[in-house]
Amino acid sequence: MFYTYLRGLVMLILWSINGNAHYHNTDKIPSRDENYILVAPHRTWWDPVYMAFATKPKQFIFMAKKELFNNRIFGWWIRMCGAFPIDREKPSASAIKYPINVLKKSDRSLIMFPSGSRHSNDVKGGVALIAKMAKVRIMPVTYNLPS
């Protein structure tokens, strides 16, 4: 419920800043009953937001660098939006186990950026491992930012 409220509030804010977003080929997105992993290049902090909007009413979890949780208010906000912290310097097994459990046992899907950051072109292998262990599909996504 709170996730839905936050998504609506953020959609209103982004609409007032950037105008109406246009989504194409949303018919390719799996049904609401199926969990999956959305993957895309990570260019801006808007990325997971627009990806979640394109697939509503589906709810998601997101990996986010642990430093984003240092600010208590912002950390609370993104946690309520489905983010969970990842230590990119010393990743633990929970970075893989947590999303696998969520994908298997809840109605939430996962949004991931295989490069791991906005400033990297290297593709990490976590997406394939999580998808294989959770037995879910990987859905590649691309987008153009508002102009």
List the model feature ranges, each with a label.
Residues 1-2, 39:
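A general boundary/transition motif marking the beginning of the first structured unit of a protein
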Residues 3-18, 75, 79-82:
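Short hydrophobic helices that act as membrane-entry/anchoring signals
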Residues 20-147:
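Soluble catalytic domains of membrane acyltransferases
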